[in-house]
Amino acid sequence: MKIEKTALTVAIALAMSSLSAHAEDAWVSTHTQAAMSPPASTQVLAASSTSATTTGNAYTLNMTGSPRIDGAAVTALEADHPLHVEVALKLRNPDALQTFLAGVTTPGSALFGKFLTPSQFTERFGPTQSQVDAVVAHLQQAGFTNIEVAPNRLLISADGTAGAATNGFRTSIKRFSANGREFFANDAPALVPASLGDSVNAVLGLQNVSVKHTLHHVYHPEDVTVPGPNVGTQAAAAVAAHHPQDFAAIYGGSSLPAATNTAVGIITWGSITQTVTDLNSFTSGAGLATVNSTITKVGSGTFANDPDSNGEWSLDSQDIVGIAGGVKQLIFYTSANGDSSSSGITDAGITASYNRAVTDNIAKLINVSLGEDETAAQQSGTQAADDAIFQQAVAQGQTFSIASGDAGVYQWSTDPTSGSPGYVANSAGTVKIDLTHYSVSEPASSPYVIQVGGTTLSTSGTTWSGETVWNEGLSAIAPSQGDNNQRLWATGGGVSLYEAAPSWQSSVSSSTKRVGPDLAFDAASSSGALIVVNGSTEQVGGTSLASPLFVGAFARIESAANNAIGFPASKFYQAFPTQTSLLHDVTSGNNGYQSHGYTAATGFDEATGFGSFDIGKLNTYAQANWVTGGGGGSTNAPPVANFSVATTGLVATFTDSSTDSDGSIASHAWTFGDGSTSTATSPSHTYSAAGTYSVAETVTDNAGATSTKTSSVTVSSSGGTGGGTVLQNGVAATGLSAAKNGQLKYTVAIPSGAKSLKIAISGGTGDADLYVKFGSAPTTSSYDCRPYVTGNTESCSFASPQTGTYYVLLNGYAAFSGVSLKATWTN
C-alpha cells in the first residue's frame, strides 16, 4: 500500500492550494513565536545610540529584559533576502521515550545500558517518512530549495528567501541595525497548515537577534572595576593558572589510564584550521600524543577564520585533551559562520551541529561552550528543537556537557553598546538593571544535558586545596574599543523558567523547574588555563573551561568502563547526596552582584551544584555500581554478526540480521572485497566487474564488543546494467530489477555545451523511484530531482545541464523488474 506516496500527493495538493489561494485551510502554531513585536507605546532604546525616546511605533525583542528598538529603524526585510532554515519535527511516542530514557540510565533496570543505535531510535521515536514527505512538499511549494532531511528525520534543512518564509510559515520578517550590525527578526509567529501541526516542532533561522555566544574569559585583571566578594579560600593555598595537563592531577585522575577508548565532540563554528594547529602545538609541548582530530562541516556556506572565537575552541580542545591525557578521537562539529566576525551565525546552524553529532553517534561526550538567553531560545523554538535532539543522545548513551554561562544570574542582560551579556552598570558604576531579576542560559537548562558551572580554584602545586564560587565582580567590557560599561563575570546558575524538573532532581530540590548547574569545575580567569591561541600562550577561564574539564575528566571514567555508563545525571543525583567523599563541595561565594544571586552552601546549591569530583574516587565508585556490580549489570555478551545477500547483475543488496543478546548493535562496518566500504546497516553495492568477492561485515555493540562475518558473493554482468554504471547518450539500460529498498546506481558524464538533458525510466513492473543529483551521489533525502510519480514512468529534465557528472539512483519503493533507464541530451 502506497502510504508514503499517497500522503505526499495529498500534501502537495494541499500545499499548492493553501499557498496560492490562502484559503480555507486552518493554520496552526509551532514552537517558533515572534522574535520581536510592536507594542502600542513605550520608552525605547534607539538602535543607533543609548538615548531613550517615546514612540508609538516601537518594537520589543521577545527575550528576558524586553530590549526595545526604535520603530523608525525597523523596515521590512527584502523578499529576496536569502535565508537558511532548519524545520524541526516532533518526536514520535514521547511518553514511551521518557520511559525508555528512565530505564536506560538507571542502574538495576532491565534496560540499563541497552543503548539504541541511531536507526533504532529513528524507527521507534523519529517522525515517519510520510510526515517528512508532507513537510518537504510544503517547503517545495513555498519556494525553498536544497532541501535535505537529517538521518533521524528530526531536522529538515532548506535554503530560501524571506518571501519563501512568508509563504511557507505565514510570518513576516523585519530588519534593523544596532551596535554596528545588521539584524533580522520575525515579528509574527511561524505557522504551518493544520495537516502539518502534529509534525512540525519549530522553524529555526527566522532571526539572528538572539544567537549562541562563546563563554570564555581572557585574563585581564586591569579591566576589573569592582572586585568580586572576598570569600577567601577553603585552604591556605595559591590561586594561579595551570597548564591543561595539570588538571588531571589536581582533580585526582592522573593514576587512571588516558581516555583512549572514548571519542569526544566539540560544537564550534567557522574555520578550525588554526585550532588544530594550536592543539598540536599544545600536545607536542605537553608530551602528549598527537590527537586524532576530525573537522566535520555542518551545512553549507562560508567557514571563515574568526580570531575572537579561536580562543574558545582552543580552550575547549586543549583542556579536554589535557585532563583526559588523550582521547580516541576529537571531532569538531563546525557550523558555517559567514565571515571573520561570525555574522552568519544563527541557532539553525548550531542546532544542526548538535544533530549531526547525534546522528553520527561516534562521540560519547560532546562539549558545548555556548549559550544564549533562555527566554529568547524558548520563543524561537530553539529550546524545543534542542531538547528533542538531546533526548536521542541520552537514548544512545551520549552525554552533552554545557557551560552554564559567564554572567552569573544576569544571563539576560545585554550591553547597550556591544551586546555582551552580563551588563550591570554604566561606565560610572551606576547600576542600570534590576539586580533581583535572574535568568539562566540555554541549552544549559535542558534536563537532557549535564550543566557545568564554575569555581575559583586554589591549589598547592598540582594538589587541589579548595574551590569557591567563581565571581570576579564587575569589569569594563571592552575598554580598548571604547566600551567602558561594566559587566559581571561569574558562574551561571539558577532555575529555568520553562524546563520541567527531571525526576532525578527531586533528591536535592523541591523546585518544579530544572535547577542547575549539576557540577562545577575551575572557571576563574585568575586560576584558569594556559593555552596556545594563534601560536601564543594566553591565560583563559570561563565556564568554557569548566565544561571541557568535566568532559575530559568523565572521558577517563567512560573509557575505563568501555563507554558503558552513558548519560550520568540520574546516577549523580542518586549517589552524590550520600557519597560526599567523591566530591569537592563548594560552600563559599555567590553568583550575583551586591549580595544578590545564589549562595553556595553545604551539599547541592544553585551556584555550583554538587561542586567538582575526584576523578579516581568516582571511577572506583562507577566501576562498582554503574558498570559491573551493585546493580550495574553483568559482563557484556558480544554481538553476533550475520547477513544475507541478493544479487542482480553487478548489484549486491545486503540485509543485516546481526543480533546482540544483552544490548544493541551500535555500528556496522562493511568491506566489499573491491576496496569499497560502507557503514550502512543494510547497504547495496554495485561492482564494476563480474566475479566472486569476499565480503565482511563487522558489528560493534553498545559496550564496544565486536563480531565479524565473512562470505563470498558472486556477481555477473547480466541483468541489464547497460555497460556497468555509466549511461551512454541515448542508450537504454534495460531489464533493471531490484528488491524493495534495493538500489541501482549510475552516472552520466555531460560534455561542455550539452543541452536538454533528460533522464527517464519506463516499463516493467513494481515501483522504482528515480533520484538525480549533480556532482555527488543522491540519497533518498538529498537530491536535485525526484519526480514523485507512482509506477515506473518518471523523468528528470534539465534545460541547461552543468558540465560534469550527474549521479542517478533507482530505489525500490517496492520490488521492481524489467525497468528501462535512459539518459539523452543534445550537443
UniProtKB/Swiss-Prot annotation:
Residues 635-722 form the PKD domain. Residues 24-237, 636-827 form a propeptide. Its main location: secreted. Ca(2+) binds at residues 585-586, 601, 603, 605. Binds 1 Ca(2+) ion per subunit. Changing residue 406 to A: Loses both auto-processing activity and proteolytic activity. Optimum temperature is around 55 degrees Celsius. Stable at temperatures below 50 degrees Celsius and completely loses its activity at 60 degrees Celsius. Inhibited by 1,2-epoxy-3-(p-nitrophenoxy)propane (EPNP), but not by pepstatin, pepstatin Ac (S-PI) and diazoacetyl-DL-norleucine methyl ester (DAN). Not inhibited by metal ions. It catalyses: Cleavage of casein. The keyword DNA damage does not apply. Its cofactor is Ca(2+). It is found in: Secreted. GO terms for molecular function: metal ion binding; serine-type endopeptidase activity; tripeptidyl-peptidase activity. Its EC number is 3.4.21.101. GO terms for cellular component: extracellular region. Residues 1-23 form the signal peptide. PANTHER family: PROTEASE S8 TRIPEPTIDYL PEPTIDASE I CLN2 (PTHR14218), TRIPEPTIDYL-PEPTIDASE 1 (PTHR14218:SF15). This is Xanthomonalisin. It comes from Xanthomonas sp. (strain T-22).
